[in-house]
A protein has these predicted regions:
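ER/secretory pathway lumenal C-terminal domains and tails of membrane proteins involved
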Residues: 2-18, 30-428
């Protein structure tokens, strides 16, 4: 339980004062409730479990004050969410963006013209557009801390919501209602980015080390590992001083599957590399390396299993810091890369022992691990780490990889000993 308690603490502590944090499912809700209700952590934050928002009783509860947090700013009356509107059709009647307040007003209206007929003949509320305009109150966004003063110029005038499906559920209707009424006075956070996926809002996030802040700054998602912009001045102190990881670094502590899964889902170790990379972009290379070291110290690979997303960015950042002149950064990168490559090779060797039907079953895993090994191999090539390239070359040769497919670092054998090469076809 210690790990989950810390996880709840980290989510709450990553948020700005007076925030609303939207959770998804049990694993990232109960730890926050535990911290807040039992230990009095961050009573100013309103925790809202989106999995419950389909229930009218929960919407009613969310409208009320809890601890030191005012209610969630919903405006729709009970008649619009009690035993009705479990699903709301989206019918694209306008080819332009409609203001979000007008959309909610349309749903609130009892005018028959604001209804649509379903296939069974019943009339129901609907959303008349897929594209919704959410105007940005820039002064409020600065005053509430949603946007730092230094980032004022990066704010957009309007955030555009793009509904991706032909209907939304009650949870999404209530989130739209909240967006129409929060007026940028209270920071909104998500524990999981996917809460905003169906609204097309993934490009308006900021990763604050644990939770994601909804911001009026456009940051297009380039890859799934790096969703959201980063404000290093906000996130670095949290990672260094505020967040807690319990005694996970103690080898006597068993990090079971659920701990591994939850730390992976919350990007706990990846966060250090992501913020370090932002520091590198600001020419703060020494600080970046300190952060990388701390991430591996608090959440060591010996405890928290390697994944490509919690390892590869560390390697990139160490080698980049080395190129920027930080003394031992490349050596640290080498040590981590060797440990990771050794683990990948152990996986590959283990799965290569299977043949027949079992061999077929594990071949996708072999392909995945070979891909990951290839990624770090080419990173080593890019960073000019000849010794490591030679070590991985030797392994590739044992798999029967042809010389022309290997990067030559002056390690070609004069005569290949053919006894090494015959291998099962699974290595293809």
């Amino acid at each position: 339980g210690d790990v989950y308690k810390r996880q709840g603490w980290n989510y709450l502590m990553s948020t700005l004062p007076n925030s609303i944090i939207l959770n998804y499912g049990d694993n990232d809700t109960f730890p926050l409730w535990n911290n807040q209700e039992i230990y009095g952590v961050r009573p100013d934050v309103r925790i809202m479990n989106t999995s419950y928002l389909g229930g009218e009783w929960y919407i009613d509860e969310m409208k009320t004050k809890a601890n030191d947090a005012p209610g969630v700013p919903f405006s729709l009356p009970k008649s619009k969410y009690t035993f009705t509107n479990d699903w709301v059709p989206v019918d694209n009647r306008f080819d332009r963006a409609v203001d979000i307040k007008d959309v909610i007003e349309f749903v609130r209206s009892e005018d028959p013209r604001s209804k649509i007929k379903l296939s069974d003949g019943t009339m129901t509320d609907y959303i008349p557009t897929k594209r919704i305009a959410l105007p940005v109150n820039k002064e409020n966004a600065i005053a509430s801390g949603i946007v730092a003063e230094k980032d004022r110029a990066q704010m957009v005038d309007t955030v555009y919501i793009n509904l991706r499906k032909n209907s939304i559920d009650k949870t999404q209707l209530m989130i739209l209602d909240m967006l129409a009424n929060f007026d940028w006075k209270r920071p909104l956070y998500m524990t999981q980015v996917y809460i905003l996926q169906d609204f097309g809002l993934m490009d308006y996030l900021q990763f604050d080390g644990y939770a994601y802040r909804f911001v009026p700054i456009l940051t297009p998602v380039q890859n799934p590992w790096e969703i959201g912009r980063i404000d290093a001045d906000y996130a670095a102190p949290l990672l260094k001083e505020t967040f807690r990881y319990g005694n996970l670094a103690d080898p006597r502590v068993y990090a079971d599957y659920f701990i591994q899964y939850n730390l992976s889902a919350s990007h706990a170790r990846d966060a250090f590399a992501r913020v370090a990379k932002e520091l590198l972009r600001q020419d703060r290379a020494q600080e970046a390396v300190e952060l990388l070291d701390m991430g591996l110290e608090k959440l060591p690979p010996s405890q928290i299993r390697f994944t490509d997303s919690n390892t590869y960015p560390f390697l990139e950042a160490y080698y980049a810091a080395s190129a920027m002149g930080v003394e031992d950064a490349a050596d640290k990168g080498d040590a981590l890369l060797r440990e990771y490559a050794r683990t990948l090779i152990e996986y590959i060797e283990y799965y290569l022992r299977f043949d027949g039907v079992q061999g077929d079953m594990v071949s996708p895993i072999i392909d995945e691990k070979l891909d990951q090994l290839g990624d770090v191999y080419y990173l080593a090539v890019y960073a000019g780490r000849k010794e490591i390239i030679g070590e991985i070359n030797a392994y590739y040769r044992s798999l029967g990889v042809e010389e022309e497919n290997l990067v030559d670092v002056g390690d070609k054998p004069h005569q290949v000993d053919t006894t090494l090469i015959p291998r099962k076809d699974t290595a293809q």
